[in-house]
Amino acid sequence: MHASAHRPFYSLFLENSMKTFFFFTYVSLAAMLSLGAQTAMAQVPAKAAACLACHGENGNSSMPNTPSLAGQNARYLYLQLRDFQEGRRDNAMMSAMTAGLSKADMQELAKYFSEQKLTNKRFNADPEKVKKGIAKANETLCAMCHLGEFKGQNEIPKVAGQNFDYVVKTLKDFKAKDRNNDAGNMTSVASTLSEEDIDNLAHYIASLN
């Protein structure tokens, strides 16, 4: 019998996921280099290069469920990397990617992505949903932590202009308590949101520049 038959499913899943990740990392980096991006890549910290396959060039993700990191608060980015490494956020891929990072590595990555410019994705938001999203944001006092227009501060993330699908996923994860590395603040807020509220908020947030 093949040896893999005796291995746990999660072990095989993680191994296959990592193989797929590294394949697409290689393809993505090769594509960027082939398009004449050698100079830009030379400015990317070595440990940040692997992040680009999912989070996009300069941290601008084109993958709906993967967040853009460009322009994000450095303090927030550092804390999330640390939470992935220490198991406070549950994501097999990110846990594997952060496993070997030192504190200095995580700070360097956070600084690099915080200094990149978030590009305008020109999200085609529904005006009526945006209006309702604004009303819900005011009702739930989002600006008390995220500040006006969701620009964030320190360990509170900037979410303005974030990918629509990722915003929806994040709010649903907090509501379902699948994510809980926020000292309970977002879990408490998200528990009051309906599916419609989440959709409206995501339209509003994704429409912000």
Segments the model singles out, each with a brief description of its role:
Residues A99-K121, D165, S191-N209:
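C-terminal capping alpha-helices of c-type cytochrome domains
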Residues G59-R89, S95-L101, N138, F150-A176, ...:
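Gly/Gly-Pro-rich "capping" loops immediately C-terminal to redox-active cysteine motifs
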Residues N16-V27:
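Bacterial N-terminal signal peptides that target proteins for export
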Residues N60-S61, E115-E128, E149-P157, K175-A183, ...:
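Inter-heme linker and motif-flanking segments adjacent to c-type heme-binding CXXCH motifs
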